[in-house]
Amino acid sequence: LCSISFDPETRRFGHQVDTLYSSEQATVQITGAEHKSASFPRVSPDGKQLVFTLSEYGNFSIWHKDADLYRIDLDSGVMHRMDEVNSDDVESYHSWSSNSRWLVFSSRRIDGLYTRPYLVHIDENGKTGKPFVLPQEDPDFYSRFMFSYNIPEFVKGKVEAEVHTIADTARKPGNRIRMEK
């Protein structure tokens, strides 16, 4: 997992690449984190922490029971397994709140089948609270709802887009970027 600077005005990447996570580093810091694939790196909006998913292999960690969340303190470079957050089943995609104090993440901890959105508070020192499933008005909602929340995201306001508009946008080609040597 590497970091490289990017200038949005010129749309150019920098030249220096910094390694944030490598399997060799993980071997030294955390037993059991060696030789795994890192995916979904997300830097907190305050720039102090980075949370990512580690799994045995590949990029679709939502299908890997071993997938867990890890955190790197970006000031010290120290990596932490998020034991308070992880369960015996999948923890995968995640998103920060705008104030860097909440994380929403996908987990299959209830039944191992469907992915549910969990929230956890993270204080300014990186200490996490106890995760909880996103509350619903009906207490039986999750036992009857047969869909997965694979990619939970925080939003600041009402989403006012029609389904067909979102689908049309998703079908459009992405923006091209250019890398120079």
Residue ranges and their predicted role:
Residues 1-181:
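Sequence signature of WD/YWTD-type beta-propeller architectures
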